[in-house]
């Protein structure tokens, strides 16, 4: 059976929506919000009615009959840690999204708007594989400092989507495979997927792992402590070096990996040195995650925007193909991944989880 779905993915200055019939996109729109519009609201939750109205108006303009929808799917927000999967949006989830139990983020509005529209139409509302997806093995949580446990913050939606896609295309099923999935975008996450669970992954936001176009990844801890107490930097400035101004931005003042590779190929030695370190660190992280899986790796998967690179992918393959064969699913399609999560539940392939 084919279901019509409205997908809602709120970002800080835009709301991306898509209408799908099954896995086929009928249309997609990015609704941009000006600073003036956003500034009117004190909190992210205060933007709820405004964003909902904008979405409904666009659907009306497109003469789309919302009564034909089977379900609404929102981007999962900063909830309490949960295992991966598709969740029915309930009142407890909405309350946690309102207050942002793990921090304020525009994606918190995804589930709230989805439930509001879904309830009015008397159809289900879901979120899929939120960024707080946490399936870490207990042994992976210990960092070496009791007050600083390792956290699971990664590109869960895309990592899970491509892992399940490979499971389907290979005919083996995600739950029967050991995979190392590497998402390469503004941040880089390398996850060990053990029979359907991400048992270890670097905290790709502000934790550890390879550096990325904008993030520092793991850094020498003693020197970081000295930097914090040197009196030269505020907390925000140090954090900025980790997130936003780390990685390629820190070294080369750009987050454009393709541009860096182009310069390297024209003979720029500094670009070459940073690029080689980038490849080295990602390869090292893949090796680390293959040890987590005790060397039993069925496939390594590269995904995210940087996986389009005709230079980087072969360079990474050369370093890691001895561990396992490599599959490349470049880019990320968050709206489709959200649609697929809902379809698996509506088709009875998976059960909706309860928050």
UniProtKB/Swiss-Prot annotation:
GO terms for molecular function: acetate kinase activity; ATP binding; butyrate kinase activity. Pathway: Lipid metabolism; butanoate metabolism. Coiled coil: none annotated. It catalyses: butanoate + ATP = butanoyl phosphate + ADP. It comes from the Bacteria. Its main location: cytoplasm. Its EC number is 2.7.2.7. It is found in: Cytoplasm. It holds the Pfam family Acetate_kinase. Gene3D superfamilies: 3.30.420.40. Also acts, albeit more slowly, on pentanoate and propanoate, and on some branched-chain fatty acids. PANTHER family: ACETATE KINASE, BUTYRATE KINASE 2-RELATED. This is Butyrate kinase. The gene is buk.
